[in-house]
Amino acid sequence: MAKKIEAYIKLQVKSGSANPSPPVGPALGQKGVNIMEFCKAFNARTEKMEKGMPIPVVITVYSDRSFTFETKTPPASFLLKQAAGLKSGSSRPNTQKVGTIKRAKVQEIAELKAADMTGADVEAMTRSIEGTARSMGLVVED
């Protein structure tokens, strides 16, 4: 018989550096999950990724306090900032542009995020990522 699911916990944790401090500790502690077990498993799964990259993770907590977790691809905004070499996006994206990014790079990001996105095809996902870039103050050029 399948285990009864008690909760889903969604967090963004930096790759290779999960530790019991907030936000991980309190979120898992409330549900009675073994925090160190999660931290060790998460760090092992993300050790090959660039250190410090924010990784969205969905933790499924079962009624017997066991858990499973699924890692997703980094947020599009993080990948865009990394590709454009920026620390942060524009505070006024419609009037103040902070950088440019090539459409080919945007398409590459869309293909990387394809597993997590709900787009019809790569072209639609590319347009979605372009919209994210524009809302950050980036200019998308051919």
UniProtKB/Swiss-Prot annotation:
Keywords: Methylation, Ribonucleoprotein, Ribosomal protein, RNA-binding, rRNA-binding
Entries under SUPFAM superfamilies matching the protein: Ribosomal L11/L12e N-terminal domain (SSF54747), Ribosomal protein L11, C-terminal domain (SSF46906)
Molecular function terms, GO-annotated: large ribosomal subunit rRNA binding; structural constituent of ribosome
GO biological process: translation
Source taxon at top rank: Bacteria
GO CC terms: cytosolic large ribosomal subunit
Post-translational modification: One or more lysine residues are methylated.
Alphabetized InterPro entries for the sequence: Ribosomal_uL11, Ribosomal_uL11_bac-typ, Ribosomal_uL11_C, Ribosomal_uL11_C_sf, Ribosomal_uL11_CS, Ribosomal_uL11_N, Ribosomal_uL11_N_sf
Function: Forms part of the ribosomal stalk which helps the ribosome interact with GTP-bound translation factors.
Subunit: Part of the ribosomal stalk of the 50S ribosomal subunit. Interacts with L10 and the large rRNA to form the base of the stalk. L10 forms an elongated spine to which L12 dimers bind in a sequential fashion forming a multimeric L10(L12)X complex.
PANTHER family for the chain: 60S RIBOSOMAL PROTEIN L12, LARGE RIBOSOMAL SUBUNIT PROTEIN UL11M
Family indicated by similarity: Belongs to the universal ribosomal protein uL11 family.
This protein's name: Large ribosomal subunit protein uL11
Organism field: Shewanella amazonensis (strain ATCC BAA-1098 / SB2B)
